[in-house]
Regions:
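Short, small-residue-biased leader/transition segments that mark boundaries at the very start
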Residues: 1-3
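Non-catalytic beta-strand/loop surface segments
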Residues: 5-60, 84-131, 142-193, 215, ...
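C-terminal soluble interaction/assembly domains
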Residues: 249-252, 273
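A common structural junction motif
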Residues: 81-89, 200-211
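Hydrophobic side chains in well-ordered alpha-helices
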Residues: 74-77, 152, 195
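Helix N-cap motif at beta-to-alpha junctions
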Residues: 67-72, 188-190
Length: 297
C-alpha cells in the first residue's frame, strides 16, 4: 500500500504519524519505508534505474517455492531463467537502524482530520523480530485484544461501553525496535479521557499481575489456529519462509514457530508487558474536524 492510499482513508495517516513520533528524525523508520508520493513525483527516470541497478540483483534476492515439487527440476528451472543475470558485487550498505536514547517519556499528539469519530492510537517500542521476548509479547497482545473474550474488548467495548472497537498488535522489525500499536474508537457520547484511562489500565494490569492460566491457554489456541490457517495457504507459507530467510537468515524457523509460542510461560508474558510504561508510550488522538475548519497534522 502506498502512502497516497493511506492519505485517502479515515485514520489512514495514523501509521505514518506513529512512526514519526516513535522514531527520531533521521532514523529510517521515522518515515514509511515504502516512501511517499512526493518522493516518487520527484524521482527522475535515472533515479529509478540507479535504484534498480543497486538493489535488484540475484545475490540480494530470495526465491521461495512451496508445494509438491521436484527439487531438482526447480533448481534447473531457476538456473535456466535466472542464471544469466549478473550478481551485483557492490551492493549498497543497509542504513544504520541503531536507536540512541529511549523515548524517555510519553509522546503525545492530536490530529484533527476528516474522520467520523475520535479514535485513540497508542504505540510502544518493542523487541526485534527474532528476539526471544517477541513471542511472549505477541501472546500478551492476544490476551489483551485477541477477539471478543480479550481484556480490552471485554472491558472497553462490552462492559464499560466507551469504545466501538479495540485492538493491539505487534509490527515486527529487524533493526532499532519493533512497534506495538493499539487503537480504540470512541463510542458516541462516551468520554475520551475515560477511554484512554481504561485502555492503559488494562495494559498496566497485565504488566503488574500477569495473565491467568485460562488466558494463556486461550492465547496459545488462537495462535495455533492462526498458524494452521497460514499453513493451509501455499502463498502464505511462501511469504513466511521468504520473510524468515530474508530478515533472519533462518527459513526453517517456520517449522519451529508453533513450538516457540507453546513454550512461552506466563512469567515471560508478564515480563514482556513491561514495555507498556509511560516512559515508552506514544499517544495519538484523531478528532473529527469541526464544520468549516481545516485539517491539522
Amino acid at each position: 500500500m502506498c502512502s497516497s492510499d493511506l492519505d485517502n482513508q479515515p485514520y489512514g495517516t495514523a501509521y505514518l504519524e506513529l512512526l514519526a513520533l516513535a522514531y527520531p528524525p533521521g532514523h529510517p523508520y521515522h518515515h514509511p519505508t515504502i516512501g511517499s508520493m512526493e518522493d516518487l513525483d520527484a524521482a527522475s527516470l535515472q533515479d529509478v534505474r540507479d535504484f534498480f541497478a543497486a538493489w535488484y540483483a540475484p545475490n540480494n534476492a530470495v526465491l521461495t517455492v512451496v508445494g509438491d515439487i521436484d527439487e531438482a527440476g526447480i533448481v534447473a528451472a531457476v538456473e535456466r531463467f535466472f542464471g544469466g543475470i549478473a550478481a551485483n558485487e557492490a551492493l549498497p550498505n543497509h542504513p544504520d537502524l541503531t536507536l540512541g536514547a529511549p523515548l524517555g517519556g510519553e509522546v503525545r499528539k492530536t490530529v484533527k482530520d476528516s474522520v467520523p469519530d475520535p479514535r485513540l492510537h497508542l504505540a510502544y517500542r518493542a523487541p526485534l523480530l527474532g528476539s526471544p521476548d517477541l513471542p511472549a509479547l505477541e501472546i500478551a497482545c492476544q490476551i489483551l485484544a485477541g477477539g471478543r473474550g480479550s481484556r480490552l474488548t471485554r472491558r472497553l467495548v462490552r462492559q464499560e461501553q466507551v469504545a466501538q472497537d479495540a485492538g493491539l498488535s505487534v509490527l515486527p522489525f529487524v533493526g532499532g525496535a519493533s512497534l506495538v500499536v493499539g487503537s480504540a474508537t470512541l463510542r458516541p457520547g462516551a468520554n475520551a479521557a475515560r477511554l484512554e484511562a481504561l485502555f492503559l489500565e488494562e495494559l498496566d494490569a497485565l504488566a503488574d499481575r500477569g495473565p491467568t492460566a485460562t488466558e494463556m491457554e486461550r492465547a496459545r489456541a488462537l495462535i495455533e489456529s492462526e498458524e494452521m490457517s497460514l499453513r493451509s495457504d501455499p502463498e502464505s507459507i511462501a511469504d513466511q519462509i521468504g520473510m524468515y530467510a530474508t530478515l533472519l537468515d533462518d527459513p526453517g524457523r517456520i517449522n519451529r514457530d508453533l513450538a516457540i509460542y507453546q513454550g512461552v510461560g506466563a512469567d515471560e508474558v508478564q515480563r514482556a508487558a513491561q514495555i507498556f510504561s509511560a516512559q515508552n508510550r506514544v499517544v495519538l488522538w484523531y478528532e473529527p474536524i469541526e464544520h468549516g475548519a481545516e485539517a491539522t497534522a
